[in-house]
């Protein structure tokens, strides 16, 4: 299976991705490293696709992944209906240059 390891154990990596995706859906955009951004984008796209069909089962699946209940409400009431006619591609990654400390490529991940 193809995915980024991000230099962390499985539990830490999953917790970090859950935090990134929760922040992305809450704020609309996040700044992070390129590898983290690509991983977060993939998960966010799947959750937004899930939110296009507002059922109890889909809400519970989203709630099992996201940390905040208010973000799940926003996902199903605002974000899902906004992209109802769009067949994917709900987020965009924009490179913003290297980080000053270690030169890691930083990106802006944002909802369209």
Swiss-Prot record:
PROSITE patterns per the UniProt record, alphabetical: RIBOSOMAL_L17
Any single GO CC term annotated in Swiss-Prot or TrEMBL for this entry: cytosolic large ribosomal subunit
The organism's superkingdom is given as: Bacteria
Q: Does the keyword Coiled coil apply?
A: no
Q: Transmembrane region positions?
A: none
Q: Which GO terms describe its molecular function?
A: structural constituent of ribosome
GO BP terms: namely:
translation
Q: Which UniProt keywords apply?
A: Ribonucleoprotein, Ribosomal protein
Pfam families for this protein? Ribosomal_L17
Which InterPro entries is this protein grouped with? Ribosomal_bL17 (IPR000456), Ribosomal_bL17_CS (IPR047859), Ribosomal_bL17_sf (IPR036373)
Its quaternary organisation is: Part of the 50S ribosomal subunit. Contacts protein L32.
Family of the protein in this entry: Belongs to the bacterial ribosomal protein bL17 family.
Matching NCBIfam families: L17 (TIGR00059)
Protein name as annotated? Large ribosomal subunit protein bL17
Whichever gene encodes this chain, its name is rplQ
């Amino acid at each position: 299976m193809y995915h980024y390891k991000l230099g962390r154990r499985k539990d830490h990596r999953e917790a970090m991705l859950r935090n990134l995706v929760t922040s992305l859906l809450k704020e609309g955009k996040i700044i992070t490293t390129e590898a983290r951004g690509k991983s977060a984008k993939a998960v966010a796209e799947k959750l937004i696709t899930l939110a296009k069909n507002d059922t109890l089962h889909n809400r519970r699946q989203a709630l099992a992944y996201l940390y905040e209940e208010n973000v799940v409400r926003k996902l199903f009431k605002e974000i899902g209906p906004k992209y109802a006619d769009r067949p994917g591609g709900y987020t965009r990654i924009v490179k913003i240059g290297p980080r000053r400390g270690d030169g890691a490529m930083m990106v802006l991940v944002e909802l369209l």
